Every structure is written in C-alpha cells, then in structure tokens.
Amino acid sequence: MARKRSIAKVIYEYSLHYFPVPGRAEASRVALALSKLPWEDVEVSSVGYEIMKNSGDLPWDMLPILKTPFGTIAESSAILRFAGREAGLIPENPYQAAKVDEFIEGMGPLARALDSTFGISDIKKRIQLRKELFEPQGAGTFNLKLLSRKIAQSETGWAAATDEMSIADLKLFTELFGLFSGNYDGIEASVLLDYPPLLEYHSKVSNEPRIHRYYQNFLKDEIRWTFHPDAFEQQKN
C-alpha cells in the first residue's frame, strides 16, 4: 500500500510529522504504509518545526511525532513499534520480539553517528569530519563492521534473526542505506563495497515484495534511490 498524503476534504485519523527526508521517520512511514491505518505523511519545514516546538506540540521537543486519535506519540522507536504492531511486523514469539527490541536499541550508535556534524556550517570541515567517521578507526566504520557481523550471523538473513521481516529490518534498512543516498555530503556510497553481507542484506530487503512495491512509488533518481533493488550495482562496477 502506498503512503497516503492529505487531499482536500479528507481527514486522516493518524498523521506522521517529520522533515521532508527519509531520516528517522522512514521506517515508521513504511510500517504505516503496510498497516491498515488511515494515515497521512506531513512534511515539516524548519520554520514549521520551530512553530510546533514553541506551541508545545512536541512532547520531547523533537520530530518525528505520530498524532493518533488517542494522543501524540513521540520518539522514532516508539512510533515504529506502534506502527509495526499494526502492520504485523512484531513477532508473536516473546523471545524473537525481545531480539527485535535488542537490535533496535543496538542501532543507537549508528543513528547518532552524524549528530555531531549537523551543526557545522563550514562545509569543508563538515565533509572532513564525516569522511573521518568511515576511516579505519572511525565510529562509522566500527558500526558498519558490527552490523555486517550481525547480519552474517543471522540464520534467517533478517536483522534480528527472526523468522520473518520485522520492524528491526525496517529500521536497519532505511537508516543504514539512507546514510549513503547523497543527502549527507561527505559520505560516499562506495563505502559499502567493503561490507558484502550488508549489500546482500540490502538485496534481500529491497526485493521483499511489500518493500519492493512500496518503493516503486518513488523515482530512482530522488532521495530514496538507495531503497531500490539495484541501488548499489553501479558502485560495484
């Protein structure tokens, strides 16, 4: 199911609010699209974000948020778990569900890897610091090696070694490969060539029928090109 956007005279019960980039809301967008919830994707500008923050619309002064008939949910992982439950992407087996939570929590350092570079206005310095993240001793390299090892160890090929795709896969797939979309200057897609297990994982998830169908709605030359099945083939040549 394609994500729904608001149109005239249509009121959706659920609305996801985030900046107009994949980022930390993308996994929840996919989960909502795979659920049966009536929802809309609300893109927030930097000015809109300040207005929301100053008006008290953001429980923790951050985006994304999900507005529901019951109230507002903040924090990307909480939103993902809510949407993932509606989409049937949380295992019923308690152990597997716990391993999904474990994997999501374990991804924290990857999600925060670029945080220290966002406030740097000097583009040359920003690019230099981001490149250093993926040098041999960089934090980015450490995280890629760890994730590559975790994927290689999974007997099922899914992120948390679950029987089926879970919200851990949505988070890993969107946040990891979204880093290499070109949206973050200084981070080259060719970095991934050193991690064959991650490229194999990309192929597995991007070709999963529901994921493949979802991203068919997006052009390959826009910011979500890294989520298409053949995204990194050119890097191999």
Predicted regions and their residues:
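GST-like domain detector, emphasizing the conserved glutathione-binding G-site
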Residues: R3-E132, F232
